[in-house]
Amino acid sequence: MGVSGSKGQKLFVSVLQRLLSERGLHVKESSTIEFYQFLIKVSLGFPKKEDLNLQDWKRVGREMKKYAADDGTDSIPKQAYPIWLQLREILTEQSDLVLLSAEAKSVTEEELEEGLTGLLSASSQEKTYGTRGTAYAEIDTEADKLSEHIYDEPYEEKEKADKNEEKDHVRKVKKIVQRKENSEHKRKEKDQKAFLATDWNDDDLSPEDWDNLEEQAAHYHDDDELILPVKRKVVKKKPLALRRKPLPPVGFAGAMAEAREKGDLTFTFPVVFMGESDDDDTPVWEPLPLKTLKELQSAVRTMGPSAPYTLEVVDMVASQWLTPSDWHQTARATLSPGDYVLWRTEYEEKSKE
């Protein structure tokens, strides 16, 4: 981390993502860049050296804690504490971590094959050696030894020898890559064992400080950016349908049901007038005149159903002999649908009483 600006940021992000991926943690590049910019703002002395040790990283943690106390925890990125804890564990396992060296020495199998092809095709030209690591040095040395006597042979033998030499080089490169993969695998196993056997007691910070840092890390943990074990999908059950109690019957059916409950069936029979009376006093049913019905309908629409004139017309209609069916038909013909529903409801309630 001896360079600054965009180059230093790219190196830091690349190295940090590779170290975390080796531990099975995948962090987004945007989160790593945000963490790097946060460290630059919090710690004025970071980064200054090519290597990073545990003491410097603990100092960065103290500065993060002080920054959170001054500006509040909302000003700290969500992934700051988890990344800080993971890198602290890495530095605990190995005292000094040379990040730039680890980045420069990471040679992939594709790079080795490209270097081998370039050496075989340019055997008659000037040879140039890079600083790619020990793997390229071994390949260049073998190519120099074999190229000394290639051109002394006839053309056919030379072509045949070139093919054999190319196969030998490919086998050697594969062996080198295999040795590198084996060493990486052993190193990962060693790091895992060291991680499991790590002593979490620390003398530089008090137990309260470490607890505070770990609580903040758990508080700012985000499953969308730091992918941990997959959660099982919870299947929600459909809510059971509510069963409502059926409403009691209304109207004549309601009256019959109430009479059956109370054991009184007198209202189920028609009313019969008993006694002596003149024929003139016997009520005679006549249909409601159409003129009276129109007058009542006009009064309801123009003045309202509760206007004094409307009530006078209703009293005139009530002076005649009307059956319940006549009243229902009259109300339906003169009132609006809403007023008719209200009238019928009140009529049924009064009938029950």
Curated annotation (Swiss-Prot):
GO cellular component, one term: viral nucleocapsid
Domain of life: Viruses
GO terms assigned for molecular function: DNA binding; nucleotide binding; structural constituent of virion
PTM per Swiss-Prot/TrEMBL: p10 is myristoylated.
Keywords: Capsid protein, DNA-binding, Host-virus interaction, Lipoprotein, Myristate, Nucleotide-binding, Phosphoprotein, Viral budding, Viral budding via the host ESCRT complexes, Viral matrix protein, Viral nucleoprotein, Viral release from host cell, Virion
GO biological process: viral budding via host ESCRT complex
SUPFAM superfamilies with a match to the protein in the record: Retroviral matrix proteins (SSF47836), Retrovirus capsid protein, N-terminal core domain (SSF47943)
Lipoprotein in keyword set: yes
Residue ranges annotated as motif PTAP/PSAP motif: 305-308
Pfam families: Gag_p10, Gag_p24
Biased composition, class Basic and acidic residues, residue ranges: 151-169, 178-192
Lipidation positions, renumbered (N-myristoyl glycine): 2
Disordered: annotated span: 151-192
InterPro entries noted in UniProt: B_retro_matrix, B_retro_matrix_sf, Primate_lentivir_Gag_pol-like, Retrov_capsid_N, Retrovr_matrix
Xref: Gene3D superfamilies: Human Immunodeficiency Virus Type 1 Capsid Protein, Retroviral GAG p10 protein
Task of the protein: Nucleocapsid protein p14: Nucleocapsid protein. Binds to single-stranded DNA.
Domain notes: Late-budding domains (L domains) are short sequence motifs essential for viral particle budding. They recruit proteins of the host ESCRT machinery (Endosomal Sorting Complex Required for Transport) or ESCRT-associated proteins. Gag-p27 contains one L domain: a PTAP/PSAP motif, which interacts with the UEV domain of TSG101 (Potential).
Protein known as: Gag polyprotein
Source species: Mouse mammary tumor virus (strain GR) (MMTV)
